[in-house]
Amino acid sequence: MWIVFGAVFLAGLGMSWRMVGNPDLGFQLNAARYLLSHGDVPRAEPFLYTVPWSRYVDLQWLWQLSIYGANQWGGVLGMNLLCVGYTFIASAILLIRCRNWCGGIGTVSAGFLLFFFMVNFWDFRPHTISWIYLSLVLLCLERHFTGDKRAVWCLPLVMLGWVNCHALFSLGLMTIGLWTVGEVVEACLAKGEDRAKSFKKVYRLIGAGALSGLVCLINPYGWEGIMFPLRQFSLLTSAHIAKDSVFGINEFVPLWGKTLVFSQYGRFCLPLNGVLLRLLFIGVGVGFLLRRPRWPAPVWILGVAFAALYLTAVKNWSYFSFALIPYAVTGWSQRMLPWRTRAAMPTRVFILALCVLLLLLMRVDWWSRATSGLGSGLAYSPTGHSRGAAETIRRAGPEVRIMNPHDLGGWLAWATGQKVYIDGRNDNYPERLYRESVATGLAENFKALIEVIRANVVVARELGEGVWIETLAKEPNWRLVFRSDGILVFMRNDLAPEIPALGKENVAGGIPSDFVAWDRQLQLEAAKPLPGWWRALPFGQLVLDGVAGQSAGSIFLGRSEEAQAYAWAGICKNRYFIVELWVNLAAAFEMAKEYRLADFCWDTILRKVPDKDLQERAEKARARRNMADPRPYQEEMRRRGLR
């Protein structure tokens, strides 16, 4: 079995070897830098100029110092090794709990651990250290339940560390409280001497739990720090816009809140993340219910609570896993006991083969893209961590006021050393600020906001903020100064005039020269087939490069020929009919008033993919032809813009 577990951990290490896309990393590093430079944790809002009066409760300071130190020592590699190390320590404690319940660890434990590694996003986030603390809390409680009188007194030490590493220390207090309720139920159901012994255990647990709550006051914010998780809980249980299925943040959406999409514009899609997250819930839930005799009351109460947390917000999948996988392993192990001897070797071979396959899929860049949308290899994702954009902003000096998307705020503040409009700390600033940023999907709201906040720098993404791009491209007092990897930076003309504006790209020779040439070439390209379903599977993956975003960005900038060139380059080099590129080409023709060519594109698209959404786009595009001053293209076509 040691070979099997070694292969599982090796597969986990291999799956962690992916690009960094975590939007929170910037403000985590920034907070550590602030602490080291000021000698204290931040208290007033340090990173946003929009809500300077807001309080910043930063209970993650110890974890932030560790990730900052790892970054200073080894960059991305150092941070990856640190977080993988945290994950592996938590996994080792999980296996100890599996052994305690099952009398040993076998292939079922290895299978569940490998499945956890497959679902894991391998982000650099404080959840990794919270997994350790949650596992330790549960280990202490379970040993106390089985008669260990000393284990429960380790809880205060665990909680003292947890409260200074992550705001979700509240999960530890919740777990202790729920387990105590369960032990009270067990004590009430006991009889005779067992009843008296059970209540002694309850009193001991209540004492240790009370002490655990008191030591949580030993944090930089005292009582305010203990109360902070209530803000997070209200976000999860309220109608906060962050939970909205359209405008919200993916990790706050309920598990079943989003429909799995298996087809997009005639192409088969494999929503691997959504499938794995649902299978995890089902596999753990069924295993939990299979155990005989039934679980004692503390485990039942804990199971219901963590299942509810997972169903409420998908971000809680990992806590659900670390809490309940040992119980699921116990249930499945009991059910598979009659086949244990016959199935042991085939199961081990299957797990080993799956580990090898996962490493191979990482090697060919499929698994990381299918699960996180990012390539493999330890490097920053350029779309979420643009060094070029940060360097351009730094050149503008200290007078910048940055208007930015929600996901880019943390990195921009860290990389530029400047305050930003908004970042990903949704539980630390008012919901109004996030609603305000969402409302900038309408041009009039965006124009009004940049005047109110006096922004002189705007950072936008080609595939996220098309309305911003199109609005600023038409404003005479703004100029485009940076464009790369899907990120655009605009500056007011009176800011850093030494930074030149970017002009149009020279596309001469990149597109057909006249209508006849266009017509002939379009006929040939339109004959290409749609990608088959197997193109979404390993070794047949269809990976669209940045040309779709580049052509969309040029549309928003009002550069028709440039947009045509980008879209046409993508169409010509691809073996298949890619709808997004044809939509962008049609939009570029609309902009140039080449309506016959635009109609050919729309008709071809709808003939190949009779989709209602595409039909609506075509109708809106044709209706715009007679408008004297149409609204921004992205605003007219779709909230989320072109791809």
What are these regions (language model features)?
Residues 36, 41, 167-290, 321:
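Transmembrane catalytic cores of multi-pass membrane glycosyltransferases
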Residues 81-101:
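Transmembrane-helix motifs of polytopic, lipid-linked glycan transferases
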Residues 143-160, 200-207, 297-303:
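Short hydrophobic alpha-helices at membrane interfaces in multi-pass membrane enzymes
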Residues 94-116:
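Transmembrane-helix signature of polytopic, membrane-embedded enzymes
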Residues 208-211, 326, 335-366:
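Signature aromatic-anchored transmembrane alpha helix within multi-pass, membrane-resident enzymes
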Residues 367-407, 414-643:
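C-terminal luminal/periplasmic domains and tails of membrane-associated envelope-modifying transferases
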Residues 137-152, 183, 284-292:
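Membrane-interface transmembrane helices that cradle and orient dolichyl/undecaprenyl
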Residues 12, 114-118, 139-140, 152-167, ...:
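Membrane-interface alpha helices of multi-pass inner-membrane proteins
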